[in-house]
């Protein structure tokens, strides 16, 4: 069988290149193996190549001018010109190195390639092969990173994977994410890990008291965490050394850290080494403190092959697939330096345990031996090649592509499930879930766990349900607890329980929820691996700092999951005895409560109300704190239905009366376009900001047909009810309407103003928008307001910003430069009233301008914030915000990442005036995205 690997840079030093050459070497004895590299970048490849593996290049970059490797009539000038043009085959956002010359050479080579199996090694190359490879060639994408965490480079995966034969990833966790995200559009999916590189590997004696770390010195490898943890452990284990092999931009910073911690005699920064085999033979331990992003770290395989145990952060993918916690290494919670220090100290101080782990590590490395991994690949090749000429193969491919278009999204957007931070169930727990699922057919498997399907629960209801799940178990067993309070906007409930009751708590939960889809995430476990367990299995768990209990819920779309983030935390607070210097108080095991890291007692002496009942707490936790927000916060929307014939007629008459043509530069159709965003923006408030007291929908006597106008939490307000001068109506100028919002009857002093294309992206508290003293926050944008006076040629928002600037210069003697991000605007009625009093002519002129004009001011989206800042009523702040221009094709993949990561507080779906995406296509994309992000109806819908 002829097998071709396609690499971007086959000569370079990288994990992908190392893995490919290792795999090629292992396959070479039984197959015809070729490595096809798009670019030649060195005279000799960094990695040695087995003589049985042929290496071929397309474009030579070793000289002054990039040129084809083949014989060619192209002149040097031709080549320079082509190399300077962007690639049409591969988007620069996927991989910027490709150009027009590489396009020509890839098209020539791939359209006629003579091979049985073509394996791509990046999503960008996969996309090119999906377009270019002959139909009889089996196409496989080999993923070398965690797909669920990729940024722009991962865009082609969900878009183009349906057009290839197979997608192979390194871990089951990534495979599961692809299965759930692609659904019926998925090609053949497989999880096959990397193999240990060939070569003699001497065993370590583990007697050298040396921790070895080969790591690139870049931020995501978090080498500083290893140094800090080593510094904490070293005083109890003198004589140990930490040897770090690698280089990178963090070298100077790490040297300073080592000096600052006084570790210059114990920690060495040694640069890269070509002799790591010998270094592993002298090692006793290795540490892997990386951030999320590791796929399947070869460094752990190399350590295990030498019989060296490991301690690693339990990140999304990688370490947990290699390390068997408590057998050949230890896993600790990500970014927890204290736990990392405790784990390495445990092994540094126990020679017998270290040796036991070393034996198991060496034994366990056989799971990744070449013959084991090659067998999995060969079985996959055989399966796929056997169907090469089956007519159903191409029909199934067409069906997959159709499913992606029909159900996955539109254009360059593809709906994706959230990237879970905790590992899916496996082994005995997975087997037990099969039994539980068989007894309750309403449960489905989502996110690696049994889940209940619900489309009727808001986030706050999920939180309350998990809270009640815990309280029921504790109260049934007579276990006392105290309901805590937080200072931040954490949506979870927290319960404090005496650490002496931990065994009873675990037993109570295990008994109460035996055979149920109730789970607990282990918080800072002392001996057990981090992760999520069925509640019924908690009795076997050792000491933990806390438990996060939850009932998984997923919507029928499978795009919204409620997991541990909405759980209830049980924290085991320890009373420090006097002999240990304690004062009888209980100490927080994880983080402080609203009144600090200590509590005088865990005997409840007060009650606090949550929903419809009271719960035990402590009197200090019932007091009104200076950090509490106790004032009401409303929300205000302005909304237009541009498809309403009556509204269109009113607008046309108004324009005609003003002597205007059908359109003008100040009134772009995009500003009025209704794509049903309001429905989903209201869903975002209901789901993620349930503290909003009331919503006011300001319209030109329009009401969405789906709106539940009977709900007490929403009120439709006519322009006629807020304009003090009725002669200003009808108006079709958003600046005009916004200048009157503070006249809404019953509106709270503090309120949020939102356009219907602005959404809350995750749970946030009122503290995100206001200070407890009532001050409003605002969020500056890096975008600046152009210098100069406003003119009729200015875009409407810039003209208004310039007018705002002039007013502030006259009133306060200062010049403002920046605009604001597209986010909810935190406002105060009193500030808007003061603006109206201080600048009556400007406010009145704006109110009386029925179409956007160059003399407008923008009161709520700009002037309020600067005026409030200069009068002490507003403060600058920050918010995690995304702005996606849906009128630009290149921005659509950001919607997929937004959906998969759900990591932004707020986001806005805007549209530029010169949109390249047709209106109907924009509508499809917006609908597909919003339906996936906010699948749960709000109470404001009929």
Swiss-Prot record:
Keywords: Exopolysaccharide synthesis, Transferase. Its EC number is 2.7.-.-. SUPFAM superfamilies: UDP-Glycosyltransferase/glycogen phosphorylase. Transmembrane segments: none annotated. GO terms for molecular function: glycosyltransferase activity; transferase activity, transferring phosphorus-containing groups. Pfam families: Glycos_transf_1 (PF00534), Stealth_CR1 (PF17101), Stealth_CR2 (PF11380), Stealth_CR3 (PF17102), Stealth_CR4 (PF17103). GO terms for biological process: polysaccharide biosynthetic process. Stealth proteins are part of a protein family that is conserved from bacteria to higher eukaryotes. Family members were first identified in microbes as proteins that help pathogens to elude the host innate immune system. Microbial stealth proteins are involved in the biosynthesis of exopolysaccharides. Stealth proteins are predicted to function as hexose-1-phosphoryltransferases. PANTHER family: N-ACETYLGLUCOSAMINE-1-PHOSPHOTRANSFERASE SUBUNITS ALPHA_BETA, PTHR24045. Belongs to the stealth family. This is Exopolysaccharide phosphotransferase SCO2592. It comes from Streptomyces coelicolor (strain ATCC BAA-471 / A3(2) / M145). The lineage of its organism: Bacteria, Bacillati, Actinomycetota, Actinomycetes, Kitasatosporales.
